[in-house]
């Protein structure tokens, strides 16, 4: 068995919190982070997280049960705070005995943290913290751990880089709280750096998206293998009247068409041929179903290929266990050379 003693020592608190061998979380990726990938990551010593996304409570119940058939190791469930059935989803997690619930996509609504921690099977709550002030508020509100995620990440992103957020937050919070760092991590060297800064662990998504165990379409994986860091771009907002939530994804015909669509709708607005609400809905609904088209159907030209800037380090399909072993070895080598 490989000796990762230096990395293990720095990860000890995070691994204990997660109940896993390594304090390496897999970021929840819609359509990708399902039973196969999640169980594979937990079985390999990491910590898998089911992406609930827009699932109904019934679908989530099935997904958790199927994941539990594939692993007896701990895993988490990522819930979107704006989901209309959030509290029903929390009940599903509680009934299934899920050990950790990750709340993403906004500030947790009133009573949600209490519901997760106060059920028949109390779970630990992990939240995302985009600023130091919000981080402190979330911890006061009962969050057990925080994820600091920078703009290098794939999917929905904030405006500040991982390295800056880590420098702002870890000195203030890492000693007394469990903090994970995410966004742009593709190699163990970076992981080692954040652990030395006080992080209890890390979260990676893009690095695991093309694992052998990932159900993503072969063409989706090939698009990742071809891509460089500069191909993973944040969505562009053309007009302030038509708000666009920043999302990082691989540029393709779909992203180009989206920019044209915004310009077209803005022009119609200028000519007063459409109501503001209808115009905003057209923009909001443009990407409906686009993630599924990319991940499941393999439509890499028109679908949404959410990817972080670390995509340039993803060059081949590898088993999850090999990816985790590489990350740990790279971290250990970096720490040994200090």
Q: What are these language model-derived features?
A:
Residues 32, 185-186:
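Residue-level detector of alpha-helix initiation sites
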Residues 159-178, 186-338:
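Conserved active-site-proximal phosphate/metal-binding subdomains
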Residues 151-152, 183-185:
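Acidic, glycine-rich active-site loops and adjacent beta-strand->loop/helix elements
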Residues 1-178:
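Active-site entrance/lid segments in N-terminal catalytic domains of soluble metabolic enzymes
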């Amino acid at each position: 068995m490989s000796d990762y003693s230096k990395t293990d020592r720095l990860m000890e608190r995070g691994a204990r919190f997660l109940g896993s061998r390594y304090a390496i979380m897999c970021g929840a990726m819609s359509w990708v982070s399902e039973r196969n990938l999640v169980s594979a990551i937990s079985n390999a010593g990491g910590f898998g997280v089911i992406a609930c996304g827009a699932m109904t409570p019934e679908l989530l119940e099935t997904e958790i049960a199927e994941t539990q058939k594939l692993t007896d190791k701990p895993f988490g469930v990522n819930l979107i705070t704006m989901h209309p059935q959030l509290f029903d989803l929390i009940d599903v997690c509680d009934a299934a005995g899920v050990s950790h619930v990750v709340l993403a996509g906004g500030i947790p609504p009133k009573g949600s943290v209490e519901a997760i921690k106060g059920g028949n099977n109390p779970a630990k709550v992990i939240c995302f913290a985009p600023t130091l002030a919000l981080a402190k508020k979330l911890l006061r509100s009962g969050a057990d751990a925080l994820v600091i995620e920078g703009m290098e990440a794939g999917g929905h992103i904030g405006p500040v880089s991982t390295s800056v957020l880590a420098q702002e937050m870890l000195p203030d919070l890492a000693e007394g709280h469990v903090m994970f760092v995410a966004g742009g991590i593709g190699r163990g060297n970076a992981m080692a750096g954040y652990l030395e800064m006080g992080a209890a662990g890390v979260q990676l998504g893009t690095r695991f998206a093309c694992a052998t165990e990932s159900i993503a379409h072969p063409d989706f994986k090939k698009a990742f293998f071809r891509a460089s860091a500069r191909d993973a771009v944040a969505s562009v907002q053309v007009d302030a009247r038509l708000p666009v939530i920043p999302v990082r994804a691989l540029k393709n015909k779909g992203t180009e068409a989206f920019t044209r669509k915004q310009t077209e709708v803005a022009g119609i607005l200028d000519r007063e041929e459409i109501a503001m609400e209808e115009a905003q809905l057209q923009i909001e609904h443009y990407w409906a179903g686009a993630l599924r088209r990319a991940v499941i159907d393999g439509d890499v030209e028109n679908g949404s290929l959410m990817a972080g800037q670390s995509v340039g380090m993803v060059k081949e399909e590898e088993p999850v266990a090999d990816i985790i072993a590489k990350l740990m070895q790279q971290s250990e080598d970096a720490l040994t050379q200090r």
